[in-house]
């Protein structure tokens, strides 16, 4: 009888330790970027209303020049994303006065970005992260839907994350106001 109890304890201990290890690994893999962290560098092709640049732009090339607004969004030509990008377009001069450069990032190809930017008359770059590598790096990719999550990051001139909105809501004007305030605080 004692032998069974000992084996039972060993089995429970093994299960307990295995469960803890699994939870630890899951926690480490789901850690996300925090305000104050160095922003992960990347290089992606992009389009504007005027051109397509296959050689791309890297975050490190932009650091030190202006504050960067990384706007991850699900897809070109969709309602919510159109609203979001038009908000950036309509407030472009104010964002420029706040020393900000907007970079929209989705999984769409640069050809779609180019046509959409022309259609909406967007003044900023739309980056093509077709394999979602950058979105995953920034914990802004939804595995279930296969699209980017709608998230906003501000990267300051030193290359640090200064602001994050994990659930940016295009229908909530306060979210854009918070973004503007965060940029104003960096001036």
Q: Can you say where each PLM-predicted feature lies in the sequence?
A:
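Bacterial N-terminal signal peptides that target proteins for export
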Residues: 4-18
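Bacterial N-terminal signal peptides
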Residues: 17-27
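N-proximal helix/coil linker or "cap" segments that precede and/or mark the start of modular domains
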Residues: 26-49
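Short loop/turn microsegments at loop-to-beta-strand junctions
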Residues: 40, 67-68, 149-151
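A short beta-strand-turn-helix
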Residues: 43-67
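Short active-site neighborhood of thiol/selenol oxidoreductases, capturing the structured segment around
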Residues: 58-83, 88
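Structural microenvironment flanking redox-active thiols in thiol-disulfide oxidoreductases
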Residues: 82-122, 132-134
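Thiol-/selenol-based redox modules, centered on thioredoxin-like
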Residues: 148-187
């Amino acid at each position: 009888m004692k032998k069974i109890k000992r084996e039972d304890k060993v089995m429970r201990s093994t299960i307990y330790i295995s469960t803890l290890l699994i939870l630890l690994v899951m926690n480490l893999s789901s850690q996300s970027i925090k305000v104050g962290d160095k922003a992960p560098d990347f290089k992606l092709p992009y389009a504007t209303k005027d051109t397509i640049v296959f050689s791309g732009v890297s975050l490190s090339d932009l650091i030190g020049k202006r504050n960067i607004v990384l706007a991850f969004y699900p897809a070109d030509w969709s309602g919510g994303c159109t609203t979001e990008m038009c908000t950036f377009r309509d407030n472009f001069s104010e964002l420029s006065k706040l020393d900000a450069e907007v970079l929209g990032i989705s999984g769409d190809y640069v050809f779609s970005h180019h046509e959409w930017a022309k259609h909406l008359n967007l003044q900023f770059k739309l980056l093509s992260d077709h394999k979602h590598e950058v979105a995953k790096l920034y914990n802004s990719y939804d595995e279930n839907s296969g699209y980017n999550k709608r998230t906003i990051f501000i990267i300051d001139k030193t290359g640090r994350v200064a602001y994050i909105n994990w659930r940016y809501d295009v229908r909530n004007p306060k979210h854009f106001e918070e973004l503007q305030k965060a940029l104003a605080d960096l001036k």
